Regions:
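Non-transmembrane "mature" sequence context
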Residues: 1-128
Length: 128
């Protein structure tokens, strides 16, 4: 069972301060992709990734993107009832996203909303 998410105002404050680098590593482990690949999805270069690791903290915009992926993985886990199924779904091309994987689609906020819409349709049994 996952821990209860903190209230929105607390998450917003944490994002504005910049999340700890460790939270990037936790999401990387949960999604099960290489750290450099996740960083690229967050628009973080290799050299910047090393600087963030040394500093121990992400910038607010990077933190916001990190939370976007975390939120989608949580939503997919709720829908599929299992983190392994959610993880597999997030990595594979989906017809409802034009043959693009949810991880790739969610690199933008608009794409993330489409992934959330698709998860909602799956939850209600509308797979198109």
């Amino acid at each position: 069972m996952r821990a209860k998410a903190p209230p929105s105002h607390e998450m917003i404050r944490r994002i504005q301060q910049g999340l700890r680098f460790h939270e990037l590593e936790v999401l990387q482990d949960n999604i099960d992709i290489p750290l450099e690949e996740l960083a690229a999805k967050l628009a973080i270069s290799r050299s910047t990734l090393q600087r963030r690791k040394t500093a121990g903290r992400l910038l607010p915009d990077e933190s916001d993107k990190l939370m976007r992926f975390s939120r989608l993985l949580d939503h997919a886990t709720d829908i599929f009832g299992d983190v392994d199924k959610a993880r597999a779904w997030m990595k594979h091309p989906q017809r409802g996203l034009g043959g693009v994987s949810p991880l790739d689609y969610a690199e933008t906020e608009m794409g993330a909303r489409e992934v959330e819409n698709l998860l909602g349709r799956i939850d209600y049994g509308v797979y198109s």
